Amino acid sequence: MTTLDDALATFATRRPVLVALDFDGTLAPLQDDPQTSRILPDGVTALARLAATDGVSLALVSGRSMNDLHTLAEVPAGTFLIGSHGAERARVTTFGLDRDVVQLSDEQADRLASLGAQALRIARGRDGVWVETKPTAVVVHTRLAEDEVARPAEDEAIALGEQLGSGVLHGKDVVEISVLRASKGEALVALRDELGASVVLYAGDDVTDEHAFEALGPDDVTVKVGDGPTAARYRVGSPQELVAALVALADPH
C-alpha cells in the first residue's frame, strides 16, 4: 500500500494538476470564534509556491460564505475559491474577486428569508447558538454551545431544513440549510473538468468533505485530516501535518 508521501511524490510529477483544499480544520486549525481562523504560516508560504508552479492550479473549497473565505484566507491571485459548499465560486485577482453570479428565483429568495426567520427562533434563548445567513443558505452554529443546548438546536435545524430547504448539511457544530442543491464534490469535479487537470489533490476534515472524496477517482490523492470514518485514501492527524506535506510538495528538492 502506498503512503501519502509516495502518492504526493507521484502527484508532483504530473501536469496539469489541481490542488484543492478545505479551509477550517484543514489549512487553518479550528477556532471557537470562526473569525479568528487563519491558514498556518507555513501553509501560506506553501500555497504561494504551489500557485507559482507551472501546471498547478490552486483552489480552496469551503463551507464558508465567499466573503468570509476571501477575507480570512491568505491566498495568491489566481486561486479559485469555492464557498458555501459549492454554491458560490470566484477567482482571486490582484484587484479582489472575479465572482460567478448566484441568481435565486423569487421562490428561493422567499424561502431563504423564511428559513432565516425560523433559524433565529431556534437560536433565541440558547447560549452559544447563532445564525449566519449566506447568499444561498442559512447556517445554525453551535460550536460555542454546551452539548445539552447544541443537540436539540441542531435537531430542530435539521427538521427545519427537511421541511423547507433543498439540502441539509450537518457538519462539525453546524447545520446548513440551502435553497440551492450544491456539494463540494460537484463543484470540485466541475472545476477539474474545466481546467483539464489530469489529477487532483483534495484534503478536508469534515463530513461535508466526504462528498469531494467520493466524487474523485482512484488516481486522485484524497486526504482526511483528523479522526472519523472516511472515503479518503490517506489520513493525517492535524492541519499541522497536512501543511508539512504541502511544504514538501511545494519544494520537493
How would you describe each model-predicted region?
Residues 129-134, 167-170:
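Short beta-strand
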Residues 145-149:
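Helix N-cap motif at beta-to-alpha junctions
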Residues 38-131:
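Active-site phosphate-binding/coordination module
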Residues 1-23, 27-31, 42, 74, ...:
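Non-catalytic pre-domain segments flanking phosphatase-related domains
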Residues 1, 14, 185-253:
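Mg2+-dependent phosphoryl-transfer enzymes with acidic/Ser/Thr/Gly-rich catalytic loops
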Residues 136-142, 174-178:
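A generic structural motif
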Residues 115-119, 152-161:
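Short amphipathic alpha-helices in soluble, non-transmembrane regions
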Residues 84, 90-110, 169-197:
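Substrate-recognition "cap/lid" segment bordering the active-site pocket of phosphatases
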